[in-house]
UniProtKB/Swiss-Prot annotation:
Belongs to the dUTPase family. Its EC number is 3.6.1.23. The lineage of its organism: Viruses, Duplodnaviria, Heunggongvirae, Peploviricota, Herviviricetes. It catalyses: dUTP + H2O = dUMP + diphosphate + H(+). GO terms for molecular function: dUTP diphosphatase activity; metal ion binding. Gene3D superfamilies: 2.70.40.10. It comes from Equine herpesvirus 4 (strain 1942). It comes from the Viruses. Involved in nucleotide metabolism: produces dUMP, the immediate precursor of thymidine nucleotides and decreases the intracellular concentration of dUTP to avoid uracil incorporation into viral DNA. Pfam families: dUTPase. InterPro entries: dUTPase-like, dUTPase-like_sf, HSV_DUT. The keyword DNA damage does not apply. This is Deoxyuridine 5'-triphosphate nucleotidohydrolase.
Amino acid sequence: MASATNLADNIVVVECSNGWEARAEADGRLLVLINNHTVELSAGLGSAGEFYSVLTDVGVRVACSSGYAIVLAQISGLPHVGREPGNFSNITFTGNLANYYTAYGIVDSGYRGVVKAVQFANGVNTVVPPGCMSLGLVLVKLSTETINVTNINLTENGRSPRVNIFYDYFAPKRDEDAGYDISAQTNATIEPDESYFVELPIVFSSSNPAVTPCIFGRSSMNRRGLIVLPTRWVTGRTCCFFILNINKYPVYITKGQRVAQLVLTEDIDEALIPTNVNYNTPFPTYSPTGAVKHNPTPILWKFTEAFDHDAPSSARSEGGFGSTGL
């Protein structure tokens, strides 16, 4: 039975399997996961195109405070692992010795299942030797405030904007969710290798300058080969992002389909989400050496063999999203 004890903001409960090594780095800003076993990224039956997606069990369960979320990312800049991927290309893999990519994943505070990464590889099978896959879990503080959203057309025409229309474009979320779902506004066909531009006619304002709205993909979309380029919603600009179809066939999106999620963060690390709109990097990596935000309170990654007891109770438990999307 799970404990009902609330976690302190700076404590993350961690259970790690023998197949992975987990250790805190960069002054505790992230938990680095390195494979102790050979990871086989095998193409599943029915996979098509040059790239195929694989759901990789990263061997950990984590539990953080409800005011936080965890971002799963591929790590670069560590001396003991291969070089990080360059910008995505269907032809070359500049700088990517391992020939695999990892999509950003959001682990909600309520998720208690094993964290899984959506990864992409080329060829028939890609084998990653022990010690050559480096992933990271980055703790991200969520904003306690919402943002005020107005229609850009009303603002530009000098008319008084309506009251906050946030929920006209973003679905309500549960307390244990990190993000607000974003639905497609129209039907669309995304051609192979096409980056489809999504723009919502809205701008935001906030009384708290630390609030940083960011847009992330959804694991279910990643598994389909539709990658939302993770980006921040830049102040003064419309809400916009790109969806890349890495398949060798067109993919159809229907109006109302959930395609992305908005996460309201506070002072998110620019090494994780740069300050500008992301136009060309569907699979960014996180470099702890490039981090510019420093947590005033050190993060304690509390390792345990009694996870179900030490982790606070959760309405979601092992179901739903948690970098699985299934």
